[in-house]
C-alpha cells in the first residue's frame, strides 16, 4: 500500500483539497458526505443568519431563532422523558423477573 510522503511545513498548503483514494476506505468513510439529517442528531445553524438585504426585520429574526431553540429544548425534554420511561420499564421488568426466579426457588 503506497504511503504519502510527509509534508514539509514550508510547502504545506492548508487550503489544498484532501486526497482520497480507493486504497484507503477508512478515509473515504470519514470524508463521505453526511446522509439525511437524523432527528437524534442536533441541527446545525447553517441557515441561522441575519442580513439586512433579506426581507426580515431583526425582531422577526430573533423570533425565528427563539422558536427554533424552544423546539430543540422541547425535543430534548421529550427525548429525556422517553429515555427515563424506558429505563424505568427495564428496571421494573428486571425486578419482576428476578422476583419470579427467587419465588420459584424458595
Curated annotation (Swiss-Prot):
Motif Di-leucine internalization motif: positions: 29-30
Gene Ontology BP term (one): intracellular transport of virus
Transmembrane intervals: 82-102
Keywords: Host cell membrane, Host endoplasmic reticulum, Host Golgi apparatus, Host membrane, Membrane, Phosphoprotein, Signal-anchor, Transmembrane, Transmembrane helix, Viral envelope protein, Virion
Subcellular location: Virion membrane; Host Golgi apparatus membrane; Host smooth endoplasmic reticulum membrane; Host cell membrane
Region (Disordered): 1-61
Source domain of life: Viruses
Positions on the Virion surface side per record topology: 103-106
Modified residues (Phosphoserine): 51, 53
Membrane-related topology note: Single-pass type II membrane protein
Disulfide pairings: none
Record bears the keyword Transmembrane helix: yes
Intravirion-facing ranges: 1-81
Pfam assignment, any one: Herpes_US9
Chief location category: virion
Post-translational modification: Phosphorylated on serines within the acidic cluster. Phosphorylation determines whether endocytosed viral US9 traffics to the trans-Golgi network or recycles to the cell membrane. Not N-glycosylated.
Record keyword Transmembrane helix present: yes
Gene Ontology cellular component list: host cell; host cell Golgi membrane; host cell plasma membrane; host cell smooth endoplasmic reticulum membrane; membrane; viral envelope; virion membrane
Family (UniProt): Belongs to the alphaherpesvirinae envelope protein US9 family.
Summary of the function given for this chain in its UniProt record: Essential for the anterograde spread of the infection throughout the host nervous system. Together with the gE/gI heterodimer, US9 is involved in the sorting and transport of viral structural components toward axon tips.
Protein name, entry field: Envelope protein US9 homolog
Organism: Suid herpesvirus 1 (strain Rice)
Taxonomic classification: Viruses, Duplodnaviria, Heunggongvirae, Peploviricota, Herviviricetes
